[in-house]
Structure formats: C-alpha cells, structure tokens
From Swiss-Prot:
Topology of this chain in the membrane: Single-pass type II membrane protein
Residue stretches in coiled coil: none
GO biological process: ceramide biosynthetic process
Glycosylation sites: 94
Family under the similarity heading: Belongs to the LIP1 family.
Name this protein carries in UniProt: Ceramide synthase subunit LIP1
Ranges in the topological domain labelled Cytoplasmic: 1-3
Recorded GO MF terms: sphingosine N-acyltransferase activity
Gene Ontology CC annotations of this record: acyl-CoA ceramide synthase complex; endoplasmic reticulum membrane
C-alpha cells in the first residue's frame, strides 16, 4: 500500500515538473523567435556598399511600432558584431504611420514604421549619407 502512495506522489511531482518545463520552453522559444509571432524582418543590402543594410519590419496586427523597433534592434545586434569592427547605425521613424497600424491585405503589409541603416566602419561614409538624408543621428556600436 505504501509503494502505491509514493508512486502516485512521484507521478504528480514529475507531471508538475514536466508542465513547468514546457511552460519555460515556450517562453524561451517565443523570446528567441519573436518575429515569427509578431513581425517579419526585411533586410535589404544597399547597392554600392559592402556592408550597409537597410532594415525594416512589417507584419500583421500585432506588429505595431513598438514590435518593429524591438525586432530592428534585435536584428542589428545579430547581424553586426562590434568585436569584428565598429558598427554604425541610425533608426528613422516613418511619422506618416500610426503607432498601431494594420496591414493593408494578406500580401501587402503596408509601410514600415521604422527603417534602420547599418554598416561597419569601412562603409562609414555611406551610412552617414543615408542617415543624413533622413535627418537621423548616427549611433556607434
């Protein structure tokens, strides 16, 4: 009789631990794959430069300006390693887009709320040119 009670106790403890593990795994997965649930990153190389990229984010209804900014900063830190060489970037706000905006259709997600230009020190002049054209300050990383 005692073995059955202890077996039941062990079963419920393991079931509880499995539930907690699955919850933590889900939180970790959604944190690392934020763009899959909210926005989609759009990374376009800038013509005539070696490392400069134009980054933006578009998506469905949960992709508001806050989510776009979060995804752009996440992509900046993933794509540009300041340990290789210093990186420069600027983030330009599209003021014609509301903070909470919705896609035009399933295929047309509408304009991006933020656009970033980023590159390494080797393309310093190109980054400055694109950022100054939009009146944005160049930041160093």
């Amino acid at each position: 009789m005692a073995i059955g009670r202890y077996g039941t106790l062990v079963f419920y403890i393991l079931a509880g631990l499995a539930f907690v593990w699955s919850l933590e795994y889900f939180k970790h997965y959604t944190k690392n794959n934020y763009e899959r649930f909210h926005c989609t990153a759009v990374v376009e190389p800038v013509q005539g430069t070696a490392t400069v990229e134009k980054l933006s984010a578009v998506g469905g209804p949960p992709c508001d300006k806050r989510a776009e900014l979060k995804l752009i900063t996440q992509k900046l830190t993933q794509h540009f390693d300041p340990n290789k060489q210093p990186a420069l970037f600027c983030i330009v706000e599209n003021t014609s887009v509301e903070s909470v905006h919705y896609p035009v259709s399933r295929t047309n997600k509408g304009p991006a709320g933020y656009i970033a230009y980023a590159g390494y020190e080797a393309d310093r002049a190109a980054v400055h040119k694109y950022c100054e054209a939009h009146g944005a300050a160049v930041l160093h990383m």
